[in-house]
């Protein structure tokens, strides 16, 4: 069931309209008020979920692949959830090492509206042989997306102007805040960073 | 008293700058790059100044284990084959600490150089002292240097080209374009690019 809710959030200095489009029913936000005066605007500005350029599947696992234009949606969602977007690959040793910390955050903070998205940068030839078996073997519960856009110079600066291109790299954002990290995370470090996003 | 307050303020600001900008030590285009003396896979020490007939250098931080570096190995060999004779030889440096990444040990470097028929020096950044001066953060990471009277000037930093996956689908050969421009006494148009790579294991 898809429930669309429009929240009007009034801040001391500015009024901000945030749109939430969720697949799950969530507990109502105490500060929300239903807006009746701006539905047309909302409809026009609500970004649509992009179509993947390809879906890679085996018997048990399926991963949606996007080019950067598609992936951008997942880096700019404005709702009441805080997103932890981790750029990784199965061949990246420090990425694989920190992955359980992101999985644990995703599991432990689900009720707190924190969602982990794992953006794989595995190469084409590795998707069937490495990525899909890895997701199955590790039983990854966080959402895994695949970024298939080899012209990296065109999109790395759009993710963050300070990103050199080394992975692991992580973006944490919500409707109000955004931070970029070109580093590995322990669970405690990740938890501490997320606690700043309220 | 005021002086002390000012001093304290400066110290705090200095400390903040040092902590908030850890990558500031790297070279920017236009900077003069340091020379080095690093051990090649043939056991001999190599410095840029020892390379004869060089007009400049294509310094590539690369390694054995990284799939992105592997994807570019043949293209790095091709760069050297094309540009060494023109005065821009490739000098490859493995910046990784072999204790952190066993695949990048000196013995494995020797094997890799042999297997892939590297026609250029493949040096170990022993002690991981050179890559931080250049500001390399990942493999592969290229610095095109031009030899001038005031030293080796950084003319290009970044990726080899715009498609790591498929050499045939490349549209922009960044390094070739930069070296071609230098050989023709022209300005390098694309001076800096970003690419995905494996973080350096220091």
Regions picked out by a protein language model, each given a short descriptive name:
Chain A
Residues 1-65:
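N-terminal targeting signals for export/organelle localization
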Residues 59-82, 108:
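A short beta-strand-turn-helix
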Residues 78-83, 112-115, 140-143, 175:
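Loop/turn elements at helix/coil->beta-strand transitions in domains of secreted/extracellular proteins
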Residues 81-83, 88-91, 123:
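Short pre-active-site segment immediately N-terminal to redox-active cysteine/selenocysteine motifs
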Residues 87-104:
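Conserved redox-active cysteine motifs that mediate thiol-disulfide chemistry
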Residues 99-138, 151-157:
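Structural microenvironment flanking redox-active thiols in thiol-disulfide oxidoreductases
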Residues 132-167, 175:
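Short, internal strand/loop/helix patches
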Residues 166-198:
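Thiol-/selenol-based redox modules, centered on thioredoxin-like
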């Amino acid at each position: 069931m898809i429930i669309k809710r429009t929240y009007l959030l009034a801040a001391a200095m500015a009024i901000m309209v945030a749109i939430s489009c969720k697949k799950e029913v969530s507990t109502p936000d105490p500060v929300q008020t239903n807006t009746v005066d701006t539905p047309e605007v909302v409809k026009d500005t609500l970004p649509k979920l992009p179509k993947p350029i390809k879906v890679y599947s085996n018997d048990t696992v399926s991963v949606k692949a996007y080019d950067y234009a598609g992936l951008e949606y997942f880096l700019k969602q404005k709702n009441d959830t805080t997103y932890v977007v981790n750029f990784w690959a199965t061949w990246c040793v420090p990425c694989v090492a920190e992955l359980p910390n992101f999985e644990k955050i995703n599991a432990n903070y689900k009720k707190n509206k924190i969602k982990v998205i794992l953006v794989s940068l595995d190469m084409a030839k590795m998707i069937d042989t490495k990525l899909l078996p890895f997701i199955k073997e590790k039983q990854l519960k966080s959402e895994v997306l695949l970024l298939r856009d080899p012209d990296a110079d065109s999109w790395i600066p759009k993710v963050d102007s300070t990103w050199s291109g080394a992975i692991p790299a992580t973006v944490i954002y919500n409707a109000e805040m955004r931070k970029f990290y070109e580093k590995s995370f322990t669970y405690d470090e990740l938890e501490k960073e997320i606690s700043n996003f309220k | 008293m005021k002086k002390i307050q000012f001093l304290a303020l400066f110290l705090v600001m200095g400390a903040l700058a040092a902590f908030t900008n850890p990558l500031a030590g790297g070279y920017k285009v236009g900077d003069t790059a340091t020379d080095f003396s690093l051990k090649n896979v043939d056991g001999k020490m190599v410095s840029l100044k020892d390379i004869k007939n060089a007009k400049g250098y294509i310094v590539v931080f690369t390694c054995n284990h990284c799939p992105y570096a592997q994807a570019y190995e043949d293209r790095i060999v091709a760069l050297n084959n094309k540009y060494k004779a023109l005065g821009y030889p490739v000098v490859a440096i493995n910046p990784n600490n072999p204790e952190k990444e066993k695949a990048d040990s000196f013995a494995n470097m020797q094997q890799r150089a042999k297997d892939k028929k590297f026609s250029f020096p493949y040096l170990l950044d022993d002690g991981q002292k050179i890559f931080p001066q250049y500001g390399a953060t990942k493999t592969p990471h290229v610095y095109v240097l031009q030899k001038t009277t005031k030293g080796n000037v950084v003319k290009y930093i970044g990726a080899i080209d715009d498609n790591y996956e498929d050499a045939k689908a490349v549209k922009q050969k960044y390094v070739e374009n930069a070296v071609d421009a230098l050989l023709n006494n022209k300005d390098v148009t694309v001076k800096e690019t970003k690419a995905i790579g494996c973080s350096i294991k220091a």
